């Protein structure tokens, strides 16, 4: 009996680590780019600003072709709107990685289906969810929507790698 109680208390102690956080309703107060927003969550007098990276997508960077249009598409969908934010993880920049819905619509799905973001299968999240985002991406590509109007658009992860390679390296002399 004691062992069972000990095991149960251990599971309860770690259960928050095993599940996603409960969804939060927040107000979107800023758009950084096509896959990152800032939301104000909480109640009057106890607001918290949260930077949110939308899960399973990667949008063009602001200085990249289609970056500004991607940012505008996310703004049109979510800016000054209530968003349902379901936290999944925290990225290396301290942003909350989350599923986001605005006006009852999944934001990641919308951005991919309109051609403003690529599927980003970090930790195989998109694959584990059944691959629906990949089908939406294939549809946007076939219709040449958004960034798919280019014959060979550069994915943001390749663009960032090129940008880093072009940065001057001072070799620690200064």
Per-region residue spans from a language model:
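Small beta-barrel nucleic-acid-binding modules, primarily SNase/OB-fold domains
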Residues: 2, 7, 11-174
């Amino acid at each position: 009996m004691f062992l069972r109680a000990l095991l149960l208390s251990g599971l309860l102690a770690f259960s928050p680590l095993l599940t996603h956080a409960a969804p939060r309703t927040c107000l979107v107060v800023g758009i950084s780019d096509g896959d990152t927003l800032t939301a104000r969550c909480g109640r009057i007098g106890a607001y918290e600003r949260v930077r949110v990276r939308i899960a399973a997508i990667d949008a063009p960077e602001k200085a990249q072709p289609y970056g500004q249009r991607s940012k505008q598409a996310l703004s049109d969908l979510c800016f000054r709107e209530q968003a349902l934010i379901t936290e999944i993880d925290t990225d290396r920049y301290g942003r909350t990685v989350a599923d986001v819905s605005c006006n009852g619509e999944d934001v990641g799905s919308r951005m991919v289906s309109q051609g403003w973001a690529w599927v980003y299968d970090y930790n195989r999240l998109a694959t584990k969810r059944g691959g629906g985002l990949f089908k939406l991406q294939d549809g946007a590509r076939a219709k040449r929507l958004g960034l798919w109007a280019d014959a060979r658009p550069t994915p943001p992860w390749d663009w960032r790698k090129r940008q880093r390679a072009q940065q001057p390296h001072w070799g620690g002399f200064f």
